[in-house]
């Protein structure tokens, strides 16, 4: 599907129907209570596999919606968004393992941090959906501030070794550049861009209203800086990028 959003949209729509039929959108895997617990039953392994498929489709669906402007297939109100057991701890352990080894880790590494996918879903619903397009300037800026706060909380939760910086320049290269760290940073900058780019819809931008105009200008400046950082980082990380990973 690399580079073909139409195909991605088509196949995700089909896959989502199977996910709904199997109920993978409404159940979450239970954590193992003890390290000496019995091996997983076939039903438990099946549920875990289906849940991973749900998260994979969910992740792709959010990117497709933001890139095409078409409505999302997965509505958060109809999904259990409980993260897989131990997801956050295993994410960075797997990233560190993969950074120093070419072997595949035991736990799946999704294309995007699942918490960012949930944030993308909220950003689309709050800023770009049909309902969101009817919001007043005040409501729109309120949503932008709340999403920006949540994105910053996510950034600060990332271990310092992998934490994206607010902006990027060649004077401060990423010491842990790898495929997964690249995707982490790219998706952080993408979220920053799509959140603050929405401020360009404010009427104050066209009418030049004083106080509101200052807030809109600072928001747009963040969007531009994030886009700039994306281009600079891609240039720096070109040597680790694989063919077909970007659409």
Predicted features and spans:
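Short beta-strand elements
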Residues: 163-167
């Amino acid at each position: 599907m690399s580079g073909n959003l139409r195909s991605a949209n088509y196949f995700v729509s089909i896959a989502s129907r199977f996910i709904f039929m199997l109920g993978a959108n409404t159940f979450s895997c239970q954590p193992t209570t003890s390290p000496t617990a019995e091996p997983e039953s076939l039903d438990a392994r099946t549920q875990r596999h289906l849940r991973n498929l749900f998260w994979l489709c969910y992740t792709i669906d959010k990117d497709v919606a933001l890139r095409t402007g078409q409505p999302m297939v997965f509505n958060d109100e109809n999904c259990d968004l409980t993260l897989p057991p131990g997801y956050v701890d295993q994410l960075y352990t797997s990233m560190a393992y993969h950074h120093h080894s070419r072997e595949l880790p035991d736990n799946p590494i999704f294309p995007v941090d699942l918490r960012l996918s949930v944030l993308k879903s909220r950003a689309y619903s709050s800023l770009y959906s049909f309902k969101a397009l009817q919001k007043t300037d005040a409501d729109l800026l309120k949503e932008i501030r709340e999403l920006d706060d949540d994105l910053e909380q996510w950034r600060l939760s990332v271990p310092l070794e992998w934490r994206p910086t607010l902006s990027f320049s060649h004077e401060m290269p990423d010491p842990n550049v790898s495929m997964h760290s690249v995707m982490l940073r790219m998706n952080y900058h993408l979220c920053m861009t799509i959140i603050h780019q929405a401020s360009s819809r404010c009427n104050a931008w066209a009418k030049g209203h004083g106080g509101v105009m200052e807030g809109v200008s600072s928001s747009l400046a963040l969007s531009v800086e994030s886009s700039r950082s994306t281009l600079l980082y891609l240039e720096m990380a070109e040597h680790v990028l694989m063919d077909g990973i970007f659409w």
